[in-house]
């Protein structure tokens, strides 16, 4: 894009979400992600016990469910996320981008995945990514 920047100067929505969570739930808390490996890595590096919802243990409730783009979204993923949210997990979205451009066309974005989870759970998430204030607070 023509802007001079180092990697340390770039803050993506996954990193911003992990930073925001540090101020809202205790370190080491179980956090389940509906998202790609990069999201799980950011959550782990922030000090949480993070894993994809498909790897969630059968018992207990996560402290938070974090939802972003998940190109392997399944019905079971939605069902597990819904269960944890309905049983008290904090519901956080990395962003609500409905689409993103790729290979000359638009593809469903993280916001489409967030909308599916929100509809299933009947709960709206805390949104961290642009243009929400959580991005600046992170």
For the regions a language model picked out, list residue spans one by one.
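HAD-like aspartate-dependent phosphatase fold
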Residues: 1-138
């Amino acid at each position: 894009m023509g802007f001079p920047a180092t990697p340390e100067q770039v803050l993506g929505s996954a990193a911003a979400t992990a930073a925001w969570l540090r101020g809202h739930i205790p370190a080491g808390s179980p956090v389940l992600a509906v998202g790609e490996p990069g999201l799980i890595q950011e959550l782990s590096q922030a000090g949480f016990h993070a894993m994809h919802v498909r790897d969630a243990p059968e018992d207990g409730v996560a402290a938070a469910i974090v939802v972003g783009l998940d190109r392997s979204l399944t019905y079971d993923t939605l069902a597990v996320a819904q269960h944890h949210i309905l049983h008290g997990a904090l519901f956080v979205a990395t962003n609500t981008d409905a689409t993103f451009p790729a290979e000359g066309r638009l593809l469903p974005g993280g916001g489409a995945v967030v909308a599916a989870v929100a509809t299933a759970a009947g709960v709206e998430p805390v949104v961290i990514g642009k243009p929400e204030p959580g991005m600046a607070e992170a």
